[in-house]
Curated annotation (Swiss-Prot):
Belongs to the universal ribosomal protein uL23 family. Keywords: Ribonucleoprotein, Ribosomal protein, RNA-binding, rRNA-binding. One of the early assembly proteins it binds 23S rRNA. One of the proteins that surrounds the polypeptide exit tunnel on the outside of the ribosome. Forms the main docking site for trigger factor binding to the ribosome. One of its GO terms (biological process) is translation. It comes from Streptococcus equi subsp. equi (strain 4047). GO terms for cellular component: ribonucleoprotein complex; ribosome. Part of the 50S ribosomal subunit. Contacts protein L29, and trigger factor when it is bound to the ribosome. This is Large ribosomal subunit protein uL23. Pfam families: Ribosomal_L23.
Length: 98
């Protein structure tokens, strides 16, 4: 698996925005990716970023209905990335001051 295929998109929720204050960044990642691969992908994708730890969460599929048909959403995996103290911030999550 290519390192640039591991990270799918950032997770922008109220909970993940509060975690930014603690230096924790949340991404949706490939379901086959393991913690070491996620760490290597983040450090390769963002310059000057050093990862201290990676926590992962497997998100179960949810039942959805469209009319009389029922189905399920796809399962996903979230990774919560904690950066070291001497690491640069990830600019993707930068909040502009007004």
């Amino acid at each position: 698996m290519n390192l640039y295929d591991v990270i799918k998109k950032p997770v922008i929720t109220e909970k993940s925005m509060y975690a930014l204050e603690e230096g924790k960044y949340t991404f949706e990642v490939d379901t086959r990716a393991h913690k070491l691969l996620i760490k290597q992908a983040v450090e390769a994708a963002f310059d000057g970023v050093k990862v201290a730890s990676v926590n992962t969460v497997n998100v179960k599929p949810k039942a959805k209905r469209v009319g009389r048909y029922t189905g399920f959403t796809s399962k996903t995996k979230k990774a919560i990335i904690t950066l070291t103290a001497d690491s640069k911030a990830i600019e993707l999550f930068a909040v502009e001051a007004e």
